[in-house]
Amino acid sequence: MEIRFATKEMIPQIKEIWNRCFGDEEDYMEFYFTHRFSEENMLVCMEDKKPVAMTTFLKAYLVTGEGEIPVHYAYAVATLPEYRGRGYAKMLLEKGKQHFQTPIVLEPASESLIYYYEKLGFRMAFCVAERTILPDEIAEAKGEEKGQQKYWLLTVTPDEYVNLRDASFTENGYIRWDKDAITYALLENDYADGYAYKVQHHGREDLLLFREEENAIEVLETTLSEQDLLAVLKRLRIKVPVRVRKSLAAVEREERAGNDKKEQGYQKKDFGMITGCDEAENGYLNLTLE
C-alpha cells in the first residue's frame, strides 16, 4: 500500500469511491472536482494499482488568544467497503498531519465516528447553537411596517462575506476560511439552489446564508440577531419551519445582553474535532461542505 497525492488522472476512480461511500451523483462530483480539487490537497491510499481510500485537506486558520495558527480541515474521509478494516483512514490522517505540519480539524458524520476519531487522538473542540423556528413565530414577529423598508437584502461577494464573517466571529476557537474557501462555499450553496445575502439594516450589515430543503428552510450561517432574523424571514414570507445554526458565542452574547429572549431556545450541538492543538474549546467551525 502506498499513500500519495491524487492526480487528475485518478479522478474517475476517486469518483467511484465518492459515489459508493457518500452516494453523491455525478453532477455534484463533477462540480466539486471542477471547483475544489487540486493535486495538492487530496491524499489517497493506492492498492491494487488504484486509489481505494481518500481524504482531502483544506487549509484554514484557527483564531487563538495570540493571533491565529494554520490548520487543515480533513474532508470526505472515505474507504471502499472491500478495503475497510485495514486502518487506511488513520494512515491518511496521520500522513496529512505529518505532511502539512498543522493541527487537523474534522466534522464527524455520526456519533459512532466521534469515538473512532477519539481513538485516533482527536477531541471535541467546536460546537454550534441550533434551533427550529416555526411558521407561527415568524408570522407573529415584528416586521417592517408598510412603506417603511428597514431590511435590504443584497448580493454578497466572496470578499464581503469574508470581511463580515471575520468581523463577527472573533472569539478564540473560530475557524477562519480564506477567500478561496468562501468562494467555493457560496458556489456550492448556489448549486444547491440556496441564497446568500448581505443584509443592510439599522446602519449595519449582516450575513444570511440559507437553502431550501424538503418542507423546510436551512439557515446554514447568519450574523443576524434573533429579532432581525425573524424580521427578515417575515419579509421573505417564509411559511415553513426554519432550522437555524448560529455561533454559540454569538447566542451567548445575545443572552447576556438580554436583547432577545428567543435566543434561549437554542441548543448547543457538538460539531467538530481537532488533533495537534490544545487551544480550541467550544470554538466555531462551520461551512464544512457537509
Model-derived regions, located:
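Amide-forming acyltransferase catalytic core, primarily the GNAT-like/NAT-type
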Residues: 123-223
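Active-site rim helix/loop that mediates acceptor-substrate recognition in acyltransferases
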Residues: 11, 18-63, 172-196
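Conserved beta-strand in the GNAT
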Residues: 44, 50-61, 71-73, 78, ...
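Conserved acetyl-CoA-binding loop-helix of GNAT-fold acetyltransferases
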Residues: 76-79, 85-99, 225-237
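Core nucleotidyl-transferase/polymerase catalytic module
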Residues: 43-45, 52, 58-63, 75, ...
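Conserved GNAT acetyl-CoA-binding A-motif
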Residues: 93, 99-110, 238-249
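Active-site/acyl-donor-binding loops of N-acyltransferases
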Residues: 118-142, 218-227, 233-290
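Extreme N-terminal starter segment of soluble prokaryotic enzymes
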Residues: 1-3
